[in-house]
C-alpha cells in the first residue's frame, strides 16, 4: 500500500497545513508549490532552495504523481490528446487545443459518468469513480510541461496553456470536493495564475451545486443544454427529470450575479432530426429570453451504437441563423483532431472494454496502445 502523500492533491491551504505538520513555516509551502506547479519538478532533490532537511523529509513521506499516459497522440492540426491511466482498468482523456491567441486544455473530472446523456460516449461506459484533486490538476501539470517541451514557452515566457475547460469526461459538479481545490490551484498566482474568466466549468445542470459554486469559486460557466423543451431534454439529458429547464434557467440567472463573465455559455449538440429544427431554435429563444447567453453549437461526433447522426452543415447554419437574428452570439464548434480520435470518451471506453474482456479471460494482460514517457523538467522522467 502506498502511504506517500501526493502533493498534487493539496491546494495552497492544504499544502501549508501539511508543511506545518512537518514542522516547517508557511513560506516553505509557497516555495514547494512554485517548484511543482510553475517549474514542473517531480523530484525533491531538484528543489535547490528548499532546506536539505525538508527535502529529506519529503523524500520519505511524499510524492508528486500524475496519471501515467497510455497514449499520446498529436493531430495534424496541432490538437494533442492523452489517454491517462487512473487504475483498475479505468482511463480518462485530456486534450490540448491550440488556437491563434490561446491554448486550451480540456480536463476530465470523473472516470466514466453517471449522467448518461444520450449522445455521449462517456456516459455509455457507466460511472466508475470520481477523480482525486491530484488526478485533475495532474492533467494540467502533465500537459503544460509536455507542451513546453513540444513548443517552448511563449514570447513573454508565458505558459503554453492559457485556458482550462472542465469539459472532459464526467460531471464536474458531482465531484465538487475534488474539483474545487483543483480549480483553486489553476487560479493561484503561485501555481498556474489563470483568471476566473479563463477557467470554464461545464455542467449538465446540477442546480444545487451551481448555487454552491457561485459562492465558493465562481468561474466561467457553460451549461450542456442540448434541448429546447423538457420532454426532449428528459430523453437526451436524463438529469433534467430532477432539475427541469425552469429550475436550470433560474439557477443560471442566480449564477450570473457572481460570475466573472456577464453571460452563460449554452452548449448544444446538433443531432440530425432530433433537436436541430428551426422550430427548436425558436423555442430556445423563448427559453433563454431572460438569461444573458451565447450558444456554442457542437456537431455531433458519432460513436458506435449511438444510433444518432450529425446534423448536416446547412442545417446547423440555418439553426445558428435563427439565434443570431435574435441577437444571440452563436458559434459553431470546429471539429478538431479527427485524425487521432473519435468521440470524447471513446478511447477510454476501449480500454475499459479490453479490461472487462481480460477479466473474463479473453485477454491475458492489458498493455498500453502506445507507451509514452511523460516528462517534468527537460530530461526528467515523470513518475508513473
Swiss-Prot record:
The active site is at residues 93, 344. It is an enzyme of class 2 (transferase). CDD domains: Radical_SAM (cd01335). It is found in: Cytoplasm. Residues 99-339 form the Radical SAM core domain. InterPro entries: Aldolase_TIM (IPR013785), Methyltransferase_A (IPR040072), RlmN_N (IPR048641), RNA_MTrfase_RlmN (IPR027492), rRNA_lsu_MTrfase_RlmN/Cfr (IPR004383), rSAM (IPR007197). Binds 1 [4Fe-4S] cluster. The cluster is coordinated with 3 cysteines and an exchangeable S-adenosyl-L-methionine. GO terms for molecular function: 4 iron, 4 sulfur cluster binding; metal ion binding; rRNA (adenine(2503)-C2-)-methyltransferase activity; rRNA binding; tRNA (adenine(37)-C2)-methyltransferase activity; tRNA binding. Reaction proceeds by a ping-pong mechanism involving intermediate methylation of a conserved cysteine residue. Belongs to the radical SAM superfamily. RlmN family. This is Dual-specificity RNA methyltransferase RlmN. The lineage of its organism: Bacteria, Pseudomonadati, Pseudomonadota, Betaproteobacteria, Burkholderiales. The gene is rlmN.
